[in-house]
Amino acid sequence: LIVIIGVVMVMFCKKQGIKKIGEVILGFGILFMGLSIMGDSMEAVKESPQMIEFLASLTNPFAAILTGFAITAVLQSSSATVGIILLMVSQNLLEFTICPFMILGCNIGSCVSARVASLSGKKDAKRAALIHLLFNVIGSAVMFLILLLAIDPFTDMMLYISGGNLARSVANVHTLMK
């Protein structure tokens, strides 16, 4: 319904301001439609023995960081990866206690596209991408140490401030670590 409203506003309205609002509405509609499709597709993941075994084996924080990094590097969007993590936690495919580590990997993985883009750029572009990478790696390393020492109190706090809602807790962890 949101997509249809956005399309109608973009296609049939003559005022530029209304068209821009229609584009925003259309964008949100497509975003929510994509999240719904991803949520529905997680049902197939639930039945895949290989995926269940892989996700069950994600108890090692280092493996979780590498997984978050790899998915984000491929998708080139930490927000999309966090959305996938959020859906997987909501569907009980992934333990909530491993999510903060995956999100640390997402933060580091988000630097890949900037590093690749800087390869053909000038010296300042390369420096900016390197500083972005170093900032995220150092920040993630500090947070990693904190999580190793206090993962249970951290996840309990996130669940408490999120009203026990796992999906909201994942979003709050991502917000906190950004």
List each model region and its residues.
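Generic alpha-helical transmembrane segments of integral inner-membrane proteins
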Residues: 4-8, 25, 62, 66, ...
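Transmembrane alpha-helical segments and their short flanking loops
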Residues: 35, 46-57, 119-177
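Transmembrane helix-bundle signature of multi-pass membrane transporters/permeases
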Residues: 1, 26-29, 33, 69-75, ...
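C-terminal ends of transmembrane helices
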Residues: 6-19, 114-120
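Membrane-interfacial helix-loop connectors
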Residues: 1, 6, 72-109, 118-120, ...
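Helix-loop-helix hairpins and the membrane-proximal interhelical loops
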Residues: 24-70, 88-91
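Membrane-water interface of transmembrane alpha-helices in multipass transporters/channels
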Residues: 18-23, 59, 93-101, 163-168
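Juxtamembrane transmembrane-helix boundary motif
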Residues: 7, 11, 31, 43, ...
